[in-house]
Amino acid sequence: MNDSQAKSAYGLGRAARLNLVWEMLNEMGETGRNMDAILSSRFKHLQDSLERRDRRDLENRIRSVLLNYRKLLWWLKKIKLAPTMRTLLLADMILSEKSDIAQLEKLCNGAHNRMDMLRKEEIAGLKRLLGQDMIHEDMSEAVIADCPQWAEQGLKEVFGDHFTEEMRALGNKPTTDFRVNTLHASRDNVRESLSQQGFKTENTPLSPVGLRQIQPGGPLLSETDAFRKGWVEVQDEGSQLVAHLVGAKKSMQVIDFCAGAGGKTLAMAAQMENGGHLVASDVHSKRLQRAKVRLKRAGVVNAERRQLENTFDKWVKKSKGKFDRVLIDAPCSGTGTWRRNPDSKWSKDETDLAELVKLQSEILQSATRLAKSGGRVIYATCSLLPEENERQIEAFLKANDTFKLLKAKDVWAELDLGDYPSRLESYFRLTPLQNNCDGFFACVLEKL
């Protein structure tokens, strides 16, 4: 039995897995669907054929192509091969895994569920990659960092001399973090419960309610007692810290204006000890429906969901000045989450960024009306680009003299949240390199 047929310990043979990776990359390019959605769909469809190691291998291969995308394009141009998902994948096999032509020919044999046979021009071009490393001395800094051109200028502005190191961290394997639901359990109790079921975690270094998985394997989180009881949710430590910066208390009226599926809503409900009043609003009904399921499982009783027709919904005007805290977790380019979503680097361009900046400005203008005098607006994104963050806030404050910027460092100290994790004082910024979590930006505005 040859390499293309062998299953070894996997549910699928290597050649079949490679073909599946190629199909999924093509689907990404043709439909614009994100990596997670495509993986989830394929895994569900093939659940009887795939073992956990199959899934991990498929995801790692796709991630490798996406994380090395700009470098692979550079190489394909150098060896004069047209850039397609097929040639990108084959080039990555040689440069990342050190496969040789003979191995690729075995895997690409044109049989059922196998990639088509290598063409003469492909063989000629790919041979020029043998013995080469992924990084070449003639590559520019941005190509080595695999930074898309639409984000290059902004990230260089933010990262400065640390651009290459910060970009490398944005390509590292992400941590898997969880937030403990303190409405029903302590962090120690949840960690022990997970451990008894073979799910090993440790306390997160910055979030007082976070756990981090320390070794792969064990059951899926959804299969654990702690998850079924609503004691724990998946949430990156950085996202947890942004929720803490809101400073929600049980005596307050609080709104999560772009609540989505409710991750930060859940975190704030726990901080409020199920007291006060919490509104989770969004323009997307499907996301709010997912929030409903999560809120019920977590035992949250102080929150209501409200679907908005648009950013300037009439309800916002009617509710003007009613809230102590307004969290705007604004839609953004997601540059801070590239280590989780490497496909998003290549699915956006300058036009998309400009549209997001315009939408963020509109959301700021609308949602800030909800804050009462002395209340606070917390603006946050999972982007690291200045046009979505610092410059967005500077423009807002210039046009709105009824708000002032509070120093994030002072707010952090006021809330007694421990060591301040950001290198900025007025603004709050986290990066994978500096904090080992997703990249986030946040700031605190006070209504005068």
Features from the language model and the residues they span:
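S-adenosylmethionine
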Residues: 1-448
